[in-house]
Amino acid sequence: MGAGMDLGFPDVCLTPIPTPAGPVPTPLPYPDIAMTATTAPAAYNVLVDCMPAINQLSAGLLSNGDEAGTLGGVVSHLFDGQTEYLVGCFTILVDGVPAQRLTSVTGQNCLAKLPNAPGMCLCPSQVTVLTLG
């Protein structure tokens, strides 16, 4: 857990478009970015670079970038929703749960397990320990 980033695209949100008849909710795609520094770790006893390791049960508390879609996502009906870590490294376990790594699949702008945008961890939070399994 550190200064890593998860990117999800497209995060399709309903955006009011002004027309002469009044605002019309229109689905528009936005990029969705989640910082791993805002993730609540599920494994506090496994440290990498003096920071708790992130596993598949960790919860990203905030993802942003879709604030213009003020009516929320077409699937989750949220904006700035949570990030769920969907697929991790099954050969390396952190507290018995698959570890998250660079290129791990995420679901972003989520309501429980219902993601509005598919995503992936594209910027590592540390480069001391590489999870290649």
What are these regions (language model features)?
Residues M1-G133:
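Intrinsically disordered, low-complexity proline/glycine-rich segments
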